[in-house]
Amino acid sequence: MANVTFTEAASTDINHRADITFAYFTQRADGSTAAGSGPNAINAYAYYPPSSKSGSDNAFAGTVWFNKNFATHKAPVSGDFSSQTFTHELGHALGLAHPGSYDASLGNPSYQNDAAYYQDSLQYSIMSYFNAGYTGADTKGVYGYGPMVDDIAAIQKLYGANMNTRTGDTVYGFNSNTGRDFLTATADNGKPVNFAVWDAGGNDTLDFSGYSQQQMINLNDGAFSSVGGGTQNVAIARGAIIENAIGGSGRDVIIGNDQDNLLAGNAGSDILYGGLGADHLWGGKDANNFTDYFVYLNAKESTVAAFDVIEDFEHGIDKIDLSGLRFNNSLSELRFIDSGSAFSGQKGEIQLNFDAFNGTTDLLMNTQSNSYAADFKIHVVGQVEQSDILFA
């Protein structure tokens, strides 16, 4: 995610001191605090990197220390406290501070008394001391798998964004091809994932198809998704572009971004917002005939030049929701006109052109006054009739 390269150095090479060193302790190196395993024991600590290459300003600069008496430090697992601790302390060694001017050595800081701003929580930064619940997240006790959105922004400010990170077509979540366990979901076991994505290119996907809970997936950068039973537990870093999203078997809400998205709701009654761009939308068919909703908030979201394709519409079951155009495009009503007839120049005219041979429908609409051509279009695989359209 940043222009930092880690190369392991032999611990016996005293002539070429590593920039960052890791070690266990039973007493702090400066002798100030004894280690232990009780409630007041120091769990881990680290020193900031040296201000000069020689590191002569601090003999401990760039060193990271873990309490040997904490058994979980010897075998950390993604999502547990020790894994979070390792990432937190490494953040210090790279130059990251706590979001506020607090520290365990200064007492027992609290969100109410010491948070410098609202987002100072583990939802936004693994460098925070404060539970993600303070900012509305619920990770079911799962700690961040790695750096979170604010950590990514901070480390990129210090070292620059790495534009070679996963430039191919990358899948995050289920069916992941990242080769990273902290960006992968493997089971619907009641423990949701908790990670932030940085991606530098390609055509990429958030895949949460293995979950059965109700989910909300948001592809906008800087936004959080609620997946696998968690709340706001997956984020996309600022500046990262993820094009596609796949939901699970529950009732999912999927929100696209300004790219050409592929959104798939899968089973369950799903709500899909394609947003801008020429999107391909699958509600997902299943034996229970659940209703899928394809929602449009503005006529710019599916134009004649760059129109959406709804790939699996079921007449009498699914709905196309155009009510957002009432407010954002000042349309007071829809006026259906016959297939193939000319637009009269009155905005709000809508036409459904069904191709029986191919089994497709083109939904065309004029949203401009004194215009005699459609400016809004959706191509639908399936038959669409007036009763399938919502405009409340």
Show the residue positions of the predicted features.
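Extracytoplasmic and endomembrane cell-envelope/extracellular-matrix remodeling and assembly machinery
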Residues: T139-P192, G201, T205, G210-M216, ...
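Soluble non-cytosolic domains of exported or imported proteins
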Residues: P76-T85, V142-V149, I236
